[in-house]
C-alpha cells in the first residue's frame, strides 16, 4: 500500500510540474493582449506634466516594440545566402567533374602510351603463355603414351621411348 501511495504521489508531482511549466511558459507563446503600452490606464493623483513625460516614454517604447515585432530576417539576405550556398556546392561539383575528366585522360594516355611505345612485353607474355601450354600438352601426351604402353603390354621394342621420365622433365 505504501508503494502505491508513492507511485501516485510521483505521478501527481509529474503532472503538476508539467502543468506548471506549461502555464509559466504560456505568456511567451500566446497572442499579444488587447492592452498595449499606448493604452492609458488612468490613475489618481497624477498631474499633467507627469502624464506628458509618461506619454513620451510610452511612445518611445511603442516605437521600439514596433521595430522588434517585425521578423528579424531580411528577404534579400536569405536570397544572397541561398545563392552563395548554391554557388559553393556547384563549384565543388564542377571541380570534382574536372578532376574526374583529368584522371580519365591521364589513365587513357598511360594505357595508350604503353601499348604504342613498348609492344614487346605483350608479345613476350603471349609467347610465354603459348610455351607453357605447349609444354603442358607435351607432358600429357607423354603420360598417355606411357600409360597405353603399360596397359597394352607393349615395350620399347615396338617404338615406344624407354626414357619416359626424361621426357617429362623437358
From Swiss-Prot:
Residues 21-79, 156-170 form a propeptide. The modification Asparagine amide is found at residue 152. Its main location: secreted. The modification Methionine amide is found at residue 107. InterPro entries: Glucagon_GIP_secretin_VIP (IPR000532), VIP/GHRH-like (IPR046963). Keywords: Amidation, Cleavage on pair of basic residues, Hormone, Phosphoprotein, Secreted, Signal. One of its GO terms (cellular component) is neuron projection. One of its GO terms (molecular function) is peptide hormone receptor binding. The keyword Nuclease does not apply. The keyword Repeat does not apply. Belongs to the glucagon family. This is VIP peptides. The gene is VIP.
Amino acid at each position: 500500500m505504501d508503494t502505491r501511495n508513492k507511485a501516485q504521489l510521483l505521478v501527481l508531482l509529474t503532472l503538476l510540474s508539467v502543468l506548471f511549466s506549461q502555464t509559466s511558459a504560456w505568456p511567451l507563446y500566446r497572442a499579444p493582449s488587447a492592452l498595449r503600452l499606448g493604452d492609458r490606464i488612468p490613475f489618481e493623483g497624477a498631474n499633467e506634466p507627469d502624464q506628458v513625460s509618461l506619454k513620451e516614454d510610452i511612445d518611445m517604447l511603442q516605437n521600439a516594440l514596433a521595430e522588434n515585432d517585425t521578423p528579424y530576417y531580411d528577404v534579400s539576405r536569405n536570397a544572397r545566402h541561398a545563392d552563395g550556398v548554391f554557388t559553393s556546392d556547384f563549384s565543388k561539383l564542377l571541380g570534382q567533374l574536372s578532376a574526374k575528366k583529368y584522371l580519365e585522360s591521364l589513365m587513357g594516355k598511360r594505357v595508350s602510351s604503353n601499348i604504342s611505345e613498348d609492344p614487346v612485353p605483350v608479345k613476350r607474355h603471349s609467347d610465354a603463355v603459348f610455351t607453357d601450354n605447349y609444354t603442358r600438352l607435351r607432358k600429357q601426351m607423354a603420360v598417355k603414351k606411357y600409360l597405353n604402353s603399360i596397359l597394352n603390354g607393349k615395350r620399347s621394342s615396338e617404338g615406344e621411348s624407354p626414357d619416359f621420365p626424361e621426357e617429362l622433365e623437358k
